[in-house]
Amino acid sequence: MRKKLFSLALIGIFGLVVTNFGTKVDAATRSYGNGVYCNNSKCWVNWGEAKENIAGIVISGWASGLAGMGH
């Protein structure tokens, strides 16, 4: 659980560092699949997509913790 919390904190810090409120995506933009996008001049976060990914991480961690309680 600590590892997942550390990962979430790291994602949050990274998101705060590279946040740019524009969400325009062009052909030269690279998506990292977690809501973070970068092109040659800047990086930014699509917070709607990032929140979905963070929620998925939290839910899967919670569910795997419940599954491990039976052992």
UniProtKB/Swiss-Prot annotation:
Keywords: Antibiotic, Antimicrobial, Bacteriocin, Disulfide bond, Secreted, Signal. It is found in: Secreted. Transmembrane segments: none annotated. GO terms for cellular component: extracellular region. Coiled coil: none annotated. GO terms for biological process: defense response to Gram-positive bacterium; killing of cells of another organism. Stable between pH 3.0 and pH 7.0. Thermostable, retains activity after heating at 100 and 121 degrees Celsius. InterPro entries: Bacteriocin_IIa, Bacteriocin_IIa_CS, Bacteriocin_IIa_dom_sf. Residues 1-27 form the signal peptide. Disulfide bonds join C38-C43. Belongs to the bacteriocin class IIA/YGNGV family. Bacteriocin that inhibits the growth of wide range of Gram-positive bacterial species. Does not inhibit the growth of several strains of Gram-negative bacteria. This is Bacteriocin enterocin-P. The lineage of its organism: Bacteria, Bacillati, Bacillota, Bacilli, Lactobacillales. The gene is entP.
